[in-house]
Swiss-Prot record:
Residues 174-708 form the TBDR beta-barrel domain. GO terms for cellular component: cell outer membrane. InterPro entries: Plug_dom (IPR012910), Plug_dom_sf (IPR037066), TonB-dep_rcpt-like (IPR039426), TonB-dep_rcpt_b-brl (IPR000531), TonB_rcpt_b-brl_sf (IPR036942), TonB_sidphr_rcpt (IPR010105). CDD domains: ligand_gated_channel. Transmembrane segments: none annotated. It comes from Pseudomonas aeruginosa (strain ATCC 15692 / DSM 22644 / CIP 104116 / JCM 14847 / LMG 12228 / 1C / PRS 101 / PAO1). Transports the metallophore pseudopaline, which is involved in the acquisition of nickel and zinc, and thus enables bacterial growth inside the host, where metal access is limited. Is probably involved in the import of pseudopaline-metal complexes. Pfam families: Plug, TonB_dep_Rec_b-barrel. It is a multi-pass membrane protein. This is Metal-pseudopaline receptor CntO. The gene is cntO.
Length: 708
């Protein structure tokens, strides 16, 4: 939406002399002055660091300050300032989000929000992490939005901590082109092109193309990778009330599978960060993904509109890898497992939403009634050696590569089919200027069919399982706008997530169930330049799979966990020249019931304290006019390094990054980013003491950006 102001000035109206008034037959009219500004849309660009609208929390275009829930938005400008090729660094500024298993560096397989790990994240409201999709590329991302607390009432199956929704770049009315090329430490090279143009004079047909090409060796020995991304999109205003948006993305990714470093005797730091424990001649894992998405919107009138959207993705991953398995008693001989993977998956999702904007007396209702259907197929083949028979060991102090490959002793083949249907009902209620409410519920029907075959040491075993789960996940929230600058809110909601497999009796497990409670305050500071959200939360999860003590080798749904604490996120302009984004979180997350893990054990990779701050100053005068200079600080507290909280932990760390941009010409900008300025040795994440991901040493990136 555009906002226009036209001014017509009559000179004669400003004259007080009757004689002069009589001499003027008509007022003199100056040229019409039109001031045009682009109003923010929930799926559109953000000016600076502060977003004011979102669709992630309600599936409607709503002001963030009107939603009774904590929402963190990390806009495109942050990704550009960081010069980050992936989105994980943006999540450092969301508050309460930490890193988890990244599947050997190939994917954003799991992450953690408010203490609970999840593998669910979304792309324009569609589940984006079915299968083993490549880690999202920043080239296509307009904003990263983090919805805190259970999101099942809107998105279905998930975990109670929260979820991430990636809002992709959409075609715009303006014609522009942006070419960005960068080169950095360890022979990292990357180029992106963002091209946007109207295809007709009326501006009804718009086209956008995003391209990315990447070749990176990285700081880890032998762990290099290449990526090619092509992402075209086109929007068509069919008539004043109807629009169609079609988006596609093709990714070709080749990368070495790398489980990281190890911690002999549970101690980190004795080995070089660059040391690789796979085999250089294993080659790379190929991960090819295709995504196609279409959205049709139609407005029947001012009150009612319809949204019909469909999303399809396909992926194929295959390749060999030698992976860390376990350390021998001496702490230096690392047993390894040789694996071959061949995975292929298809996922299709269709959504139909009817939206209404009605009044009952003085009360306004924004209604959402939605249907969703998903069909997912996944086929996995894993061949693996058996370390207990063929250790395939390597000395971590003096690794010698090129050993003969051990034979495959185990053959696992899995086939999974999922059919899921859901009904969404939601009412955003405006009782008055000060009071707002939110009611929502989702009804899910989930059916999963699994077939698995295993050949282990010459013995063949086939298992099949089927489960059908039904769940109703409500949420309720209320917001009180105490003053124009202060809003108080509270909410409660539920989540569910199906558990795969069966118990000793062959019965499908009950799904995990979560509950979340949140209360907080939203602040609008410095005349609207800076926004801040502070929220306290209490989350519980039950029916977590744990070992069945009566039947070794089987599981039961007896585990429970709890997370509580508070988090803070702020973003905006401290002054007209200084933009800021920052976050802090205190999280107390622990096991409250488990057959194997002690009560009170910390949850994996969850720091009690974490915080971040980035500030960028824009010069407006002198020879530095148009230049930027900034810094970012990120702190992560110590964390449990394995799921049993056995005493192995990752130490706390603080990193400092610097950035600068200098305009060489009106359309050319030179950029410099220095990451980990003080070269701190740190560890981002772990799964156990032989799967530990070290952080990058100090590194430099130079970039050139051309705008047309």
């Amino acid at each position: 939406m555009r906002v226009s102001v036209s001014l017509v000035l009559g000179v004669g109206l400003g004259c007080s002399s009757p004689a002069l008034w009589a001499e003027t037959e008509s007022p003199a009219e100056l040229e019409v002055l039109t001031v045009t500004a682009e109003a923010e849309r929930a799926e559109g660009p953000v000016q600076g660091y502060r977003a004011n609208r979102t669709a992630s929390a309600t599936r409607t275009d709503t002001r963030i300050e009107d939603i009774p829930q904590a929402i963190s938005v990390v806009p495109r400008q942050v990704l550009d300032d960081l010069d980050s090729a992936r989105i994980e660094r943006a999540l450092d500024f969301a508050g309460g989000v930490s890193r988890q298993n990244n599947f050997g560096g190939l994917t954003m397989f799991e992450y953690n929000v408010r203490g609970f790990t999840t593998s669910e994240f979304y792309r324009d409201g569609f589940s984006a992490n079915r299968g083993y999709m490549n880690a999202p590329d920043s080239a296509t991302i307009e904003r990263v939005e983090i919805l805190k607390g259970p999101a099942s009432s809107l998105y279905g199956r998930g975990d109670p901590g929260g979820t991430v929704n990636l809002v992709t770049k959409k075609p715009q009315a303006e014609r522009f082109a942006r070419l960005h090329a960068s080169a950095g430490s360890w022979d990292r090279y990357r180029s992106t092109l963002d091209l946007n143009t109207p295809l007709d004079e009326e501006g009804d047909l718009l086209y956008r193309m995003n391209l990315a090409v990447e070749d990176s060796k990285g700081f880890r020995d032998y762990a290099d990778g290449q990526r090619l991304l092509v992402a075209p999109s086109i929007s068509w205003q069919l008539d004043p009330d109807t629009s169609l948006l079609v988006e596609a993305e093709v990714v070709r990714n080749r990368q070495v599978f790398d489980r990281g470093t190890v911690a002999p005797h549970n101690h980190l730091g004795s080995l070089p960060r660059s040391r690789f424990f796979g085999e250089p001649d294993d080659g790379k894992i190929d991960n090819n993904n295709e995504t196609l998405q279409a959205t049709l919107r139609h407005h029947f009138n001012e009150q009612w509109s319809l949204r019909l959207a469909s999303h399809y993705k396909h992926g194929h991953l295959d390749g060999y890898a030698s992976e860390n398995s376990s350390l021998a008693a001496d702490g230096y001989s690392l047993r390894r497992e040789y694996r071959y993977r061949d995975f292929e998956w298809h996922d299709s999702i269709t959504q139909l939403d009817l939206l209404g904007d009605l009044h009952t007396g003085s009360i306004r209702h924004q209604l959402l009634m939605g249907l969703e259907y998903e069909r997912y197929h996944n086929d996995e083949l894993i061949l693996r050696s058996i370390p207990s028979r063929n250790p395939y060991a390597i000395d971590i102090r003096r690794p010698v590569y090129g050993q003969p490959k051990p034979p495959f002793g185990r053959d696992d083949r899995n086939h999974e089919e999922v059919d899921a249907m859901a009904l969404n009902l939601q009412d955003q209620i405006e009782f008055s200027e000060k009071w707002r409410g939110l009611l929502g519920v989702r009804f899910d029907r989930y059916r999963q069919d699994m077939n698995a075959t295993r050949l282990n040491n010459g013995r063949f075993r086939e298992t099949s399982s089927q489960q059908t789960q039904r769940a109703a996940t409500p949420r309720i929230g209320v917001l009180y706008q105490a003053t124009p600058e202060v809003g108080l809110f509270a909410n409660a909601s539920k989540s569910f997530k199906p558990n795969g497999g069966t118990d000793m009796a062959g019965k499908a497990f009950d799904p995990e169930e979560g509950r979340g409670y949140e209360a907080g305050v939203k602040l609008d500071l410095l005349d609207g330049r800076l926004g801040m959200t502070l929220a306290a939360f209490h989350l519980k999860k039950k029916n977590v799979l744990t070992a069945d003590p009566s039947n070794p080798g089987y599981q039961q749904t007896a585990g429970e966990a709890r997370s509580q604490g508070f988090d803070l996120q702020f973003s905006g302009q401290l002054t007209e020249q200084l933009r800021l984004i920052g976050a802090y979180a205190y999280i107390d997350a622990e096991v409250t019931k488990d057959e194997n893990i002690a009560r009170g054990s910390r949850l994996l990779n969850v720091p009690k304290h974490s915080g971040s701050l980035m500030g960028v100053y824009e010069f407006r005068e002198g020879w530095l006019h148009g230049a930027d200079a900034g810094a970012a600080v990120n702190y992560v507290g110590e964390r449990a390094g394995d799921s049993s909280d056995s005493g192995f932990e990752l130490p706390a760390y603080t990193t400092v990054d610097l950035l600068a941009r200098y305009p060489l010409a009106s359309n050319a900008t030179l950029g410099v980013n220095v990451n980990n300025l003080f070269d701190r040795r740190y560890y981002e994440r772990s799964y156990n003491n032989v799967w530990v991901a070290p952080g990058e040493p100090r590194n430099l990136t130079m970039s050139l950006t051309l705008n047309y």
